[in-house]
Amino acid sequence: MYRRELLTALAGDDPPDVFLLDDEDVPRVVDRGGALDLAPYLGRVGVDPARYDQTLVAVFRRGAGLYGLPRGYTPVVVAYNKDLLDRAAIPYPTDDWTWDDFLRVAKQLTRDTDGDGSIDQWGSAFDPRLALWLPWIWSGGGDVLCADGRRASGCLDSRATIEALRWYAGWSTSAGLAPRIHDARDAPGAIARLFASGRLGLMTTGHWAIPRLRASVAAGRLRVGFVAIPHRAGVAPATVLYVSGYAVPALTPRRKAAVELVADLTDSAAAMARAEAGMELPAVAAAARAVAEADTLGWDAAFLRAAAHGRPSWGARVGAWRDVADRLADLMDRIVITRVDPARAAGVTARELDRLLGATR
C-alpha cells in the first residue's frame, strides 16, 4: 500500500518534502529519476556522509550521486533459547560456528519432552520467506543471481547453491529438525510463537524481533541470545542487510529544507529512540556502537558483529527484484512441498530468471 501511494505521490503535483525509502524501492525510485541527488546539498547543511555506515550509504549511491541517507538497518541472525541450551548442556553458539555445529545443536534440541511419542520441542524452524533463507544460501557459498544481477544461470544452478538449497530445505523434508507448519502464510507467526513459548531452540530472524523478545525476557519467560548465521565449513561468513532511509523528491521546490530534514531524521534523537526501542540499528556508525555498548543484554553487539559480514539484499540493485523474489519463493515451494529435486528446480528457475532479467534490463 505505502509503495503504491508513494509512487503516485512522487508522480503528482504535490509530492512530500521527504519520504521513507526501503532498499527494495531504491531501483524503482532512484533509477527512474524520482529522487533528488543530495550530494550537492549535504556540505551546505553541515552533513558528513562519512558518519554513516558506508555499506548502507552505498545502497543509495548511483555513481557520484547520493539519493538518500540511511536511517537504520538489520542483519539477519539466529536467535537462540538459552534455557533450552542450558538444559541440554550445550554451550552457546559463537560467531564462528558452522553448518555442522548448527545441525548438531538443532538435533540435540529436537525432543519428545513429555514421552508421548511425538516431538514437541524442535531445534529450528524452516522459514519459507526468501528474506530469511537467502542468507543461508550466501553462507553456503551460493547465490540466487550472478554478480552483475543480470542473470541467474551459472549461480542459482551452481553446485554450491543447489547444495545450500538442499541443506536448508532438508530441515523440513528429511532432517526432522523443524515443525510442520501446514499454512505457509502463518509460518512467520507460528515460528515466533513457538520460540516465545520455549518450544523452539534456534530461530532465523532480524532486529524486528527484539521488541517482543525484550518484553518476554523482562517478564522472565525467556532467556535469549543472538549469534551470526553459521557458515558452511570453508566458506566465509555472510548475511543479508536490510536497509531503510530517507530521500527527497526530485521535483521538490524546498530542496535545502528537505535535505536538512533528511539529515535530522537519520542522525538525531528520533533515530536513537528507534534504535533503543529495538526496532533497528542506527545507520550512523557511532550511534550504532553507542547503542551496542549500552545494551546490557549484549544483543545489539551480536547484531553489529553479524553485520560486519553482511551485504545489502539484491533488492537494492535489481529493479525487477519483486518478480525475481516471487519465482524464488516458488522454487522453494517446489523443493519442499512437491519434493522436486533441488538441482532440477534450480535449473528451471534459473532459465526463467534469465528471461525475466533480460526482458526488464
Give the positions of each predicted feature.
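Short helix-initiation/N-cap motifs at beta->coil->alpha
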Residues: M1-E5, E24, W97-R104, R180-A196
